[in-house]
Design a protein with these regions (language model features):
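Hydrophobic, well-ordered secondary-structure segments
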Residues: 8, 23, 39-42, 74
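Short, Asp-centered acidic motifs that coordinate Mg2+ and/or phosphate
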Residues: 20, 55, 79
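NTP-binding/hydrolysis catalytic cores, primarily Walker-type P-loop NTPases
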Residues: 8-16, 113-128
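Conserved catalytic network of the ASCE P-loop NTPase/AAA+ motor domain
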Residues: 12-16, 47-52, 72-75
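Conserved beta-strand segments of the P-loop GTPase G domain that flank and frequently precede/overlap
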Residues: 24, 29-31, 57-61, 83-84
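Conserved inter-motif catalytic segment of the P-loop NTP-binding fold
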Residues: 1-35
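Substrate-engagement module of ASCE P-loop NTPases
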Residues: 33, 37-63
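Phosphate-binding/switch region of NTP-binding enzymes
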Residues: 60-120
């Protein structure tokens, strides 16, 4: 079969104007060798998204093994969202941090989210 970066590059170049592209998860592409090929793919993706007025969402998993090129992914990203989920007994707590917001101002506070049937944001000030 084709190498994952080659296949992904063909799909990206075929995206029509004003597309929404979701890569879920990006981990397989971040793990390809050599690293220069991944950087080239990210450059092409960024250029195509900008030139077509599109949106790219790259879902990056953090777990036992984070791919070595995750820093490269975050460098290319315009906005980085970090969602942290903690489980205490039978309660689930979700917190969202936005450490990078290119061209804007990232919130300095961590945002507590209630992810049930719909998303609500806890606007009380106990969001640290």
């Amino acid at each position: 079969g084709e190498a994952p970066l080659d296949n992904a590059g063909k799909l990206v170049s075929a995206l029509p104007e004003t597309s929404n592209l979701i890569v879920d998860p990006l981990d397989v592409l971040e793990s390809q060798e050599p690293p220069s090929r991944f950087r080239s793919f990210m450059n092409d993706l960024q250029n195509h998204v900008v030139n077509t007025g599109s949106l790219g969402i790259l879902h990056c998993l953090e777990g036992r093994s984070v791919p070595p090129l995750r820093d490269t992914t975050e460098h290319f990203a315009d906005v980085v969202f970090h969602l942290q989920t903690n489980i205490k007994g039978d309660e689930v707590e979700n917190k969202l941090a936005i450490p990078k917001f290119r061209g804007g101002r990232a919130p300095s506070d961590i945002i507590k989210l209630d992810l049930v049937e719909r998303v609500s944001i806890d606007t009380s000030r106990d969001i640290a």
